Amino acid sequence: MTEQATTTDELAFTRPYGEQEKQILTAEAVEFLTELVTHFTPQRNKLLAARIQQQQDIDNGTLPDFISETASIRDADWKIRGIPADLEDRRVEITGPVERKMVINALNANVKVFMADFEDSLAPDWNKVIDGQINLRDAVNGTISYTNEAGKIYQLKPNPAVLICRVRGLHLPEKHVTWRGEAIPGSLFDFALYFFHNYQALLAKGSGPYFYLPKTQSWQEAAWWSEVFSYAEDRFNLPRGTIKATLLIETLPAVFQMDEILHALRDHIVGLNCGRWDYIFSYIKTLKNYPDRVLPDRQAVTMDKPFLNAYSRLLIKTCHKRGAFAMGGMAAFIPSKDEEHNNQVLNKVKADKSLEANNGHDGTWIAHPGLADTAMAVFNDILGSRKNQLEVMREQDAPITADQLLAPCDGERTEEGMRANIRVAVQYIEAWISGNGCVPIYGLMEDAATAEISRTSIWQWIHHQKTLSNGKPVTKALFRQMLGEEMKVIASELGEERFSQGRFDDAARLMEQITTSDELIDFLTLPGYRLLA
């Protein structure tokens, strides 16, 4: 075991190789990763620069819109390459981080697909990222098991769910591996290692290397992924279209480019997904300079609001026209041990999923196995003997306009809502910088999107000098006062021992910095990553 940085070609690894690393960072795997990093990092950096330029244009008054130059793609008659047999039925998908016990429980749940997450529900500390790759390799090979401290053994049942791997977004670095002195893209690290170690075993059992792509903002980013996938297929002599991806439409710029995104990735894409929580965060962030587009309390921004309903319907219409799946969004509720409260939770999930299924979505997301039966029953009811709803074209819909997609929604900004935002965001940030990205808070399974909505909402209320429903103006001073008060509430709710052992001071400091800074910080996970091992 060496202490100095290990260099292979042009990649430098800042961590020593332990037993876990040796299993994943084999010479052949690192050679493939090196090729991807050297081929594709320069263009990825240009794509990130283009994001900054686009945001500056929006800040200066140019609202997002459909692209006139690509009208021919939108108007032409074309379809994606196709959907593999084991992805034709995705009526319920469960998501969760790539932790060993969670991987087993998710694959065993009453669902069709498990999205194993290296992104928003995993705090990417080095050991967790490496262990995650080991866990997925063992899951693909069918050998994964886990024994807890009490001696309970977890292992896979026959016919587990289909596995899809969500890689990190384009903006996230993997700081423990550098190329030319810079941290490499986390997305390429996650993709290269999962693909390299698993494509043969996946194909041998009639599945394939399937991916979820997060936080895309443009068709050019989708085209970049298409080139990455095609390179990997050619490198290992695989037919074009072996790698399949589902792409999350969870940024405001991307909703105006869904046809173009599907077209750019047409050999590899099988569907789009309504990443609704990140989409709300992106709406706030993208339109941060517009005082007439400030959102109310997070709790008031529901899928029946016009701008979100338009987004859901346009996604379904666009996907089905092109032969691609239109996946619904996340139900983040956690089942309750109290029967009456649990019935309320399940009724909310049922209503939410019924709206999606009736709109024409092909499937939906849950964050907890205890919701699987409820979500499954809703989609079974609507689907009947069908595997999906690809034939639901929504041709009766009037064309959805940019104005509808950008329309702000009504609702109050309340003191109670602002205080709840503070408590949720601080608790989430504390968990994330402690290495846990998937956190139960007040009956919801929260990931980074929730904290992002919370802190950007308050930033925007301060920035535009909004008032709360009780007449109090939202200022930095009011926020700081509430932050101090809510820290005491968190301490009393969690108990002194948990509070004092945690990293709540660090979390509050980061929350204060990103909420009161003059410029809105792009993603809290970027400064958060500096506080992670």
UniProtKB/Swiss-Prot annotation:
<keyword id="KW-0963">Cytoplasm</keyword>
<dbReference type="InterPro" id="IPR044856">
    <property type="entry name" value="Malate_synth_C_sf"/>
</dbReference>
<dbReference type="GO" id="GO:0006099">
    <property type="term" value="P:tricarboxylic acid cycle"/>
</dbReference>
<protein>
    <recommendedName>
        <fullName>Malate synthase A</fullName>
        <ecNumber>2.3.3.9</ecNumber>
    </recommendedName>
</protein>
<dbReference type="InterPro" id="IPR006252">
    <property type="entry name" value="Malate_synthA"/>
</dbReference>
<comment type="similarity">
    <text>Belongs to the malate synthase family.</text>
</comment>
<dbReference type="InterPro" id="IPR019830">
    <property type="entry name" value="Malate_synthase_CS"/>
</dbReference>
<feature type="active site" description="Proton acceptor">
    <location>
        <position position="166"/>
    </location>
</feature>
<dbReference type="Pfam" id="PF20656">
    <property type="entry name" value="MS_N"/>
</dbReference>
<keyword id="KW-0329">Glyoxylate bypass</keyword>
<dbReference type="GO" id="GO:0005737">
    <property type="term" value="C:cytoplasm"/>
</dbReference>
<dbReference type="InterPro" id="IPR011076">
    <property type="entry name" value="Malate_synth_sf"/>
</dbReference>
<keyword id="KW-0808">Transferase</keyword>
<dbReference type="InterPro" id="IPR048356">
    <property type="entry name" value="MS_N"/>
</dbReference>
<dbReference type="GO" id="GO:0004474">
    <property type="term" value="F:malate synthase activity"/>
</dbReference>
<dbReference type="InterPro" id="IPR048355">
    <property type="entry name" value="MS_C"/>
</dbReference>
<dbReference type="GO" id="GO:0006097">
    <property type="term" value="P:glyoxylate cycle"/>
</dbReference>
<comment type="pathway">
    <text>Carbohydrate metabolism; glyoxylate cycle; (S)-malate from isocitrate: step 2/2.</text>
</comment>
<feature type="active site" description="Proton donor">
    <location>
        <position position="447"/>
    </location>
</feature>
<keyword id="KW-0816">Tricarboxylic acid cycle</keyword>
<dbReference type="Pfam" id="PF01274">
    <property type="entry name" value="MS_TIM-barrel"/>
</dbReference>
<dbReference type="Pfam" id="PF20659">
    <property type="entry name" value="MS_C"/>
</dbReference>
<dbReference type="InterPro" id="IPR001465">
    <property type="entry name" value="Malate_synthase_TIM"/>
</dbReference>
<dbReference type="InterPro" id="IPR046363">
    <property type="entry name" value="MS_N_TIM-barrel_dom"/>
</dbReference>
